[in-house]
Design a protein with these regions (language model features):
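A composition/biophysics-driven feature that prefers long, compositionally simple stretches
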Residues: 1-262
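Short catalytic-site patches enriched in acidic/histidine residues
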Residues: 67-78, 214-219, 229-234, 272-309
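Active-site pocket-lining segments that scaffold enzyme catalytic pockets across diverse folds
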Residues: 239-293, 298
Length: 309
């Protein structure tokens, strides 16, 4: 039983099975994705955040999956700071971590996403950090992870992106998540590189940063909590003013919301004749939310009579 881990059934573990399960698959899609429209805007946000903390290593986790029941997880939503600064969208990538690595001498960032409106302007402030995106890329189909890991295995959750694909889409250097501990510890210490983490995003990463601080002789406890709060505050305030790309996204969300209400209105006749009419309306609106976005931002808030005034 112990060998099953979190799996509810026992998996075959012999070479014949491994040879069978790893063979006969069709080719994966070739080529690399185009650069994301969000990439240059995310680069500008990272540059703005880094300017507040020159010489410090900034750790921004996406967050972890949360179990709903058995081996089923809730739909994933990354931490807002990660999504905003990585520019990867609202479903990338459980357990990923964006690290803004301090440059020893501020200059042009090695990330290839251009900052909007300031390509080579010498008056533009030099970047203080290089972004590195750590995540778990897809494994080989000959690996045990491919068929044996219900959380990350391709057989269970579909094709995961490669490091090269995410680099192409984001313009951010990517690395395997297994290399994160060494990267956080590099040159850390008093009088050297300091660390800050968005502590609420991922408990495991926060614990890793705490351990790294302890080994490097950096402050922990309340002092570290205040340091981390400064990063969370700066990242949050950065989201207050929307850039042109975000404004376009808000307009698209408004249009999708209107379309959802249009579908809801068309469902009213069927809802009136159904014993759970409110669910008919919720379903109509929710379908549009899934088609045009990631889902509902809020559950239904409905009122009638004096409560609606």
């Amino acid at each position: 039983m112990a060998s099953r881990g979190s799996n509810r059934s026992r998996q075959p573990d012999n070479q014949a099975f491994r040879d069978f399960i790893s063979s006969g698959w069709g080719p994966r899609p070739g080529g690399l994705p185009a650069r994301s429209e969000a990439a240059p805007w995310a680069a500008a946000r990272r540059e703005a955040l880094g300017a507040h903390f020159p010489g410090e290593r900034l750790v921004l986790p996406a967050g972890a999956l949360k179990v709903r029941n058995n081996d089923c997880d809730y739909r994933f939503r990354p931490h807002s700071a990660f999504a905003h600064l990585a520019g990867t969208g609202a479903d990338f990538e459980p357990d990923a971590v964006l690290v803004l690595e301090p440059l020893t001498s501020p200059g042009r960032n090695t990330n290839t996403a251009q900052t909007p409106g300031a390509p080579d302007d010498p008056t533009h402030a030099a970047p203080t950090h290089e972004a590195v995106l750590y995540f778990r890329p897809r494994a080989s189909r000959s690996s045990r992870e491919f068929y044996g890991d219900p959380r990350y295995g391709e057989l269970w959750v579909g094709v995961r992106p490669s490091l090269e694909e995410v680099e192409a889409a984001t313009g951010v250097r990517c690395a395997h998540i297994d290399s994160l501990p060494d990267a956080l510890a590099k040159d850390a210490g008093p009088g050297a590189v300091q660390l800050r983490v968005v502590a609420e995003a991922d408990e495991a990463i926060t614990d890793l940063v705490t351990t790294t601080r302890q080994k490097a002789g950096l402050e922990t406890g309340q002092v570290a909590a205040e340091v981390d709060a400064g990063l969370a505050e700066a990242a949050s305030e950065l989201r207050l003013v929307k850039d042109p790309w975000e404004i376009d996204q808000l307009r698209a969300a408004v249009a999708a919301t209107k379309a959802g209400f249009d579908d809801l209105i068309r469902s009213i006749p069927r809802a009136r004749g159904h014993w759970r009419g409110e669910r008919v309306l919720e379903g109509a609106f929710g379908a549009k939310a899934r088609e045009e976005g990631n889902g509902l931002g809020y559950d239904t808030i409905a009122a009638a009579g004096n409560h609606a005034n």
